[in-house]
A protein has these predicted regions:
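Bilobed "Venus flytrap"/periplasmic-binding protein-like clamshell domains
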Residues: 29-64, 128, 132-198, 293, ...
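A structural signal for short loop-to-beta-strand junctions that line the ligand-binding cleft
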Residues: 116-129, 252-261
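An extracytoplasmic/periplasmic, membrane-proximal ligand-sensing/linker region
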Residues: 191, 208-226, 278-334
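N-terminal secretory signal peptides and thylakoid transit peptides that target proteins
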Residues: 1-15
C-alpha cells in the first residue's frame, strides 16, 4: 500500500504544480503502465516511479532529496499487462510500460501472437528488469523426467492467445515434438494445477517468477517433479530466439522438489522510439543510481533481481537511443 499511496501523492503533486504557471513548464509527466495490482509488475512500477521522480521544488539528490530526474513526475498505473502495455505505448497513451521480452519481440516483428498484425516498430527497451522462469511441472509418478517423456501424456500448454502457449510450442519444436504427440489441453496455470491435483492431467507449462503459489501448493500436497529444459534442445532455442535466456529453478524453491535448469524470458521496461533521447538517458541514469539500488533491494523480492549487469540481456528488441547511450558509457555495450 505504501508504494501505491506514494505514486498517488506524486500524481497529486504533479496536478498541483501544473496549476502554477511559473512551474508548469518545468514538469514532465511520465507514465509507467504495469499490470494487475495483485501481481509483481505493479509494485515494481511503484518503486521505479518513485526512483525516477524529482518534482520541481524538491530537494536535489546532493542535498538528500530524490535522485530522480529533475522535473519528472512518474506514476505507476495498473493495467492488463504486457499486451495492453504494448498497445498503450504504440498509441501514445503511456510513455512506458512493462512487457515480457517474448511479447515485445513478437510485437516488434509481427510474429507469434502478433502474426498478421502491423509491426509495432516504435517499441524500444529501457532495461531488462528481472527473469520470468519457465516451469514444466509433472505429476509425481507420471513417468515424466524429460521433455521427450511428454509423448502420449495429458499436457496443458496454457490458455489460447497467451504468450506461454506460443513459447511452449517453440520449446516442444526445439525437442522435435508438437502438440499432436500428446493429449494437449489449454488451461491457465491454476486450472492446470487443479486438474493435475485431481490426477486428470500429467504435466503443464507455466511462466512466472518462483515460487508460484499454485505450484508450491502442489509440491506440498500432491507431489511434483520439475522437468528440465536443457541440453541440445535448449541450446537450439537460445540460439534461434533472442528473447529466451538460460535460467534455473534452485533446489528448495518448492518444498521437497529438486531444482532444474530451464529457460526464461524477461520482464522488460519498454518505451517508444518517439520519446526524447535525453529524457530516457536521464531516466536510465536515475534507474541505476545507488539510491535506487537501496530502494529496489528493500522494496520487493523481485527488486533485488534488477541489476545493471543484466540490463541489456535477452531484450529481443532494440534499446531506446537514450538508454543505449547510458549503457555504452557504463561499458555494457560497445
Amino acid at each position: 500500500m505504501r508504494i501505491n499511496r506514494r505514486s498517488m501523492l506524486l500524481g497529486g503533486l504533479g496536478t498541483a504544480l501544473a496549476a502554477s504557471p511559473t512551474l508548469a513548464q518545468d514538469i514532465t509527466f511520465f507514465r509507467i503502465n504495469t499490470g494487475g495490482t495483485a501481481g509483481t509488475y505493479f509494485p515494481i512500477g511503484g518503486l521505479i516511479a518513485n526512483a525516477i521522480s524529482n518534482p520541481p521544488g524538491s530537494r536535489t539528490c546532493a542535498d538528500g532529496g530524490s535522485c530522480g530526474v529533475p522535473g519528472v513526475v512518474a506514476t505507476a498505473v495498473a493495467s492488463n499487462g504486457s499486451v495492453a502495455n504494448v498497445s498503450a505505448i504504440a498509441g501514445g497513451s503511456a510513455q512506458s510500460g512493462f512487457t515480457q521480452s517474448d511479447v515485445a519481440y513478437w510485437a516488434f516483428n509481427a510474429s507469434g501472437i502478433y502474426e498478421g498484425r502491423p509491426k509495432v516498430d516504435v517499441l524500444r527497451a529501457i532495461a531488462n528488469l528481472y527473469p520470468e522462469t519457465f516451469h514444466l511441472v509433472a505429476r509425481k509418478g507420471a513417468g515424466i523426467k524429460t521433455i521427450k517423456d511428454l509423448k502420449g501424456k495429458r499436457v496443458s500448454l496454457d490458455e489460447p492467445g497467451s504468450g506461454t502457449l506460443v513459447d511452449a510450442r517453440l520449446i516442444l519444436a526445439a525437442y522435435g515434438l508438437t502438440e499432436k504427440d500428446m493429449k494437449a489441453e489449454y488451461l491457465k496455470s491454476q486450472q492446470a494445477a487443479d486438474k493435475l491435483k485431481d490426477n486428470a492431467l500429467d504435466a503443464f507449462f507455466s511462466v512466472s517468477g518462483w515460487p508460484l503459489g499454485a505450484i508450491a501448493e502442489l509440491a506440498a500436497t500432491t507431489g511434483i517433479d520439475l522437468v528440465p529444459i536443457d541440453g541440445p534442445g535448449a541450446e537450439k532455442l537460445l540460439k534461434q530466439y533472442s528473447f529466451f535466456s538460460a535460467d534455473q529453478i534452485p533446489d528448495g524453491a518448492y518444498k521437497g522438489v529438486a531444482g532444474v535448469k530451464t529457460v526464461g524470458v524477461h520482464a522488460l521496461w519498454t518505451t517508444s522510439s518517439k520519446q526524447n533521447d535525453e529524457l530516457i538517458y536521464k531516466i536510465a541514469v536515475a534507474l541505476w543510481n545507488p539510491a535506487t539500488r537501496k530502494l529496489l533491494d528493500s522494496g520487493h523480492a523481485k527488486g533485488r533481481e534488477i541489476k545493471l549487469d543484466s540490463a541489456t540481456q535477452g531484450l529481443g528488441i532494440p534499446l531506446h537511443a537514450g538508454a543505449e547511450k547510458f549503457y555504452k558509457e557504463q561499458g555494457l555495450l560497445k
